[in-house]
């Protein structure tokens, strides 16, 4: 077993808490940080604190923003009557990379998962229903991960929203359990084009 000096071990431990970062990558990142000049480390620390203190949730769609409303919600060129429902901001970013979707989003903040004690009340589903019921919405597109949790959440939302508007779900050319953020832009664009009606 490798023994690190205490400050280095602590730094590696922090990096290991990041999603998708294993011990080797954490070690590589920590060693890279130690090679940087103090000014770079100060700038990095400042950027971390600034992002942590100033980035919150859009009051309308719950995307990340430093304003009351995110850039997408404020953009008058986007179709405000077309809402794409995603689990996390990372999924929104994946769809934006595909450059196919011209509407707005609603980030629910996870998926219904009874095994993990995540019920609909812990997600931004009630706010979505309120948003749809108070506006003239042409279509809701559900772009949730193709998994048991994603299917459960889609069916639950579809049932709640179908009295108000058309609800569709994007088509998938990927295996069950795949994360949207790892899907290439062409596949995502085709998935949006080939969406099917849920209600």
Curated annotation (Swiss-Prot):
The protein's name in its UniProt record: Recombination protein RecR
Chain intervals annotated as zinc finger (C4-type): 58-73
UniProt function note: May play a role in DNA repair. It seems to be involved in an RecBC-independent recombinational process of DNA repair. It may act with RecF and RecO.
GO MF entries: DNA binding; zinc ion binding
Keyword DNA repair: yes
Pfam families: RecR_C (PF21175), RecR_HhH (PF21176), RecR_ZnF (PF02132), Toprim_4 (PF13662)
Transmembrane listed as a keyword: no
Organism: Prochlorococcus marinus (strain AS9601)
InterPro entries: DNA_Rcmb_RecR, Rcmb_RecR, Rcmb_RecR_Znf, TOPRIM_dom, TOPRIM_RecR
Signal peptide annotation: none
Family, per entry: Belongs to the RecR family.
SMART domains with a match to the protein in the record: TOPRIM
Location of the Toprim domain: 81-175
Lineage start: Bacteria, Bacillati, Cyanobacteriota, Cyanophyceae, Synechococcales
GO biological process, alphabetically ordered: DNA recombination; DNA repair
Gene3D superfamilies: 3.30.60.80, 3.40.1360.10, 6.10.250.240, RecR Domain 1
Keywords: DNA damage, DNA recombination, DNA repair, Metal-binding, Zinc, Zinc-finger
């Amino acid at each position: 077993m490798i023994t690190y000096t205490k400050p280095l071990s602590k730094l590696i431990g922090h990096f290991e808490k990041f999603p998708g970062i294993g011990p080797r990558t954490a070690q590589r990142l920590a060693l890279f940080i130690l090679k940087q000049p103090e000014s770079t480390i100060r700038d990095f620390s400042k950027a971390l604190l600034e992002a942590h203190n100033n980035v919150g949730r859009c009051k309308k769609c719950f995307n990340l923003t430093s304003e009351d409303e995110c850039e997408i919600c404020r953009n008058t060129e986007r179709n405000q009557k077309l809402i794409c429902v995603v689990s996390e901001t990372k999924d929104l970013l994946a769809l934006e990379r595909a450059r196919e979707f011209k509407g707005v989003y609603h980030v629910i903040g996870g998926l219904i998962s009874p095994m993990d004690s995540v019920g609909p009340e812990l997600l931004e589903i009630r706010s979505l229903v309120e948003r749809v019921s108070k506006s003239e919405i042409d279509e809701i597109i559900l772009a949730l991960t193709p998994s048991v949790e994603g299917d459960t959440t889609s069916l639950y939302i579809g049932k709640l929203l179908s009295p108000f508007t058309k609800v569709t779900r994007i088509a998938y050319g990927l295996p069950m359990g795949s994360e949207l953020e790892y899907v290439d832009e062409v596949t995502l664009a085709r998935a949006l084009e080939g969406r099917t009606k849920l209600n």
